[in-house]
Design a protein with these regions (language model features):
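Terminal, compositionally biased segments used for targeting/anchoring and flexible tails
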Residues: 1-116
């Protein structure tokens, strides 16, 4: 695990763009895990539900941020079939715990992360 790589700001073309449905961009994007954490509380709940049920969050986390552990924790939420504020709150909790965990670790270590 490369902490600096996970916490970095990615180029604009690799940012996460929030949509409420295909073709309906919200005007909100996130270029880092920290920015993504902030946007969870700002974006329309319909956007969170849209991306969550498609698996878009974990795909971006695994492929762009290269944080497979966080992607797996978000994927585990699928079994709870969350929506509305319950989804927003749980997603924010998982991402914020991950950010705190990453920012408190020396970059040379590879501690295990799990919220379950």
């Amino acid at each position: 695990m490369n902490v600096e790589k996970i916490l970095r700001t990615v180029p604009r073309e690799k940012a996460f763009y929030f949509f409420t449905s295909i073709g309906n961009y919200t005007g909100i994007s996130a270029s880092s895990i920290g920015e993504f954490m902030e946007k969870i509380n700002e974006v329309n709940i319909k956007s969170l539900e849209f991306h969550f049920h498609r698996g878009d969050f974990e795909k971006w986390m695994a492929e762009v941020l290269e944080d497979k552990e966080l992607a797996e924790e978000v994927r585990k939420l699928q079994k709870f079939n969350l929506s509305g504020d319950a989804l927003r709150n749980r997603l924010h909790e998982i991402v914020s715990k991950r950010v705190r965990h990453l920012t408190s670790q020396p970059s040379s270590t590879e501690p295990k992360f799990s919220v379950f």
